[in-house]
């Protein structure tokens, strides 16, 4: 009898814990925000009221027990940034163009079109640009092309390879002007004297 009671208790606990959906996994309800709203009081969860941190029955930031969002319809994360222009054109033949600008200076544009089929099928070439301002005030502007050979960005903020030393450039130029007969390792049998300048 005790074994049946123990198994039944374990099953009830398991079913009870499985049936509860934690609020951190739920999306906010439409029209409600995370911070609560004016007049939601301090009777529910974290962040109820007008910027307060309510202490009540189990809600995340709402106005009642178990509520998730607040009642004020506010949004978190600062001011909303307007989209000042938006264009999206899809011509149906595979070519397209889109662009947008926002109120805080972010802009992007891209156009693309299919090209003649290559060995792997139809290739689409895209060209575009985007720009934005970093938190420290630096303007970032990037242009790019993307095709069957990859993504090719250009911008003054991108790192560049270090310059090739003069000695290496002279060596490369010498090798271009004086190619070897085979272009591969010859086992030390080339050059004058048979030892290629090595002294044994």
Swiss-Prot record:
Superkingdom as given in the UniProt entry: Eukaryota
Biased composition (Polar residues): 101-110
Region listing for Disordered, in residue ranges: 100-119, 177-200
Coiled-coil portions: none
Signal as UniProt keyword: yes
Biased composition (Gly residues): 185-200
InterPro entries listed in its UniProt record: CHIT_BIND_RR_consensus, Cuticle_Struct_Prot, Insect_cuticle
A single GO cellular-component term on record: chitin-based extracellular matrix
Secretion signal span: 1-18
A GO molecular-function descriptor: structural constituent of chitin-based larval cuticle
Disulfide bonds: none
Keyword annotations: Cuticle, Signal
Residue span, Chitin-binding type R&R domain: 93-162
Role of this protein: Component of the pupal abdominal endocuticle. May have important role in the larval cuticle structure.
Name of the protein: Pupal cuticle protein 20
Organism: Manduca sexta (Tobacco hawkmoth)
């Amino acid at each position: 009898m005790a074994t049946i009671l123990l198994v039944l208790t374990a099953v009830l606990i398991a079913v009870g814990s499985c049936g509860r959906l934690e609020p951190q996994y739920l999306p906010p309800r439409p029209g409600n925000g995370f911070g609560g709203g004016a007049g939601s009081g301090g009777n529910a969860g974290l962040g109820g009221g007008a910027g307060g941190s309510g202490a009540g029955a189990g809600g995340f930031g709402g106005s009642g027990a178990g509520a998730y969002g607040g009642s004020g319809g506010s949004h978190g994360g600062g001011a909303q940034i307007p989209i000042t222009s938006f264009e999206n054109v899809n011509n149906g033949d595979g070519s397209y163009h889109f662009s947008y600008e926002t109120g805080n200076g972010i802009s992007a544009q891209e156009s693309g079109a299919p090209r003649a089929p290559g060995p792997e099928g139809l290739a689409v070439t895209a060209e575009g640009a985007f720009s934005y301002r970093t938190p420290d005030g630096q303007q970032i502007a990037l242009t790019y092309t993307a095709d069957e050979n990859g993504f090719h960005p250009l911008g003054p903020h991108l790192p560049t390879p270090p310059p090739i030393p003069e000695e290496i450039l002279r060596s490369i130029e010498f090798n271009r002007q004086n190619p070897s007969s085979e272009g591969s390792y010859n086992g030390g049998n080339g050059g004058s004297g048979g030892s290629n300048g090595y002294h044994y």
